[in-house]
Amino acid sequence: QIDYVEGNGSRTIKGEWHFSRVLEGMAIQDVIILPDYEYGTTLRIFNPHTRAWDVAYGYAGKIIRLEARKQGEMIVLTCTGDENRKWVFVRIDDKKFHWQNVTVQNNGDWLINAEIVAERIR
């Protein structure tokens, strides 16, 4: 179960985000369901040459490519076409996680465009 909140706080959407291992454990796929807003799927495959995850997110006629790396306690996914656009798993624990869609400003500050607080249901 997830709560999707737009950065300006104008809208909160209840949804679901399902994760599973696919391709005999070689990849992780997820499906995100945000009713009346967005439905999408992501495929993450570890690249041994770059020591990072190659990521593709597809939704409603569009695909976004990213590269994911661990940075301290966070997992940071950077858009391959725009290094200022990032998706960040800020905090992950056994029961919940916190995700943010951010844009890096010219001064280096992160502008939060949207965030998700998710509770794990097993």
Question: What are the language-model segments listed below?
Answer:
Residues Q1-R122:
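Hydrophobic small-molecule pocket/channel-lining residues, especially in calycin-type beta-barrels
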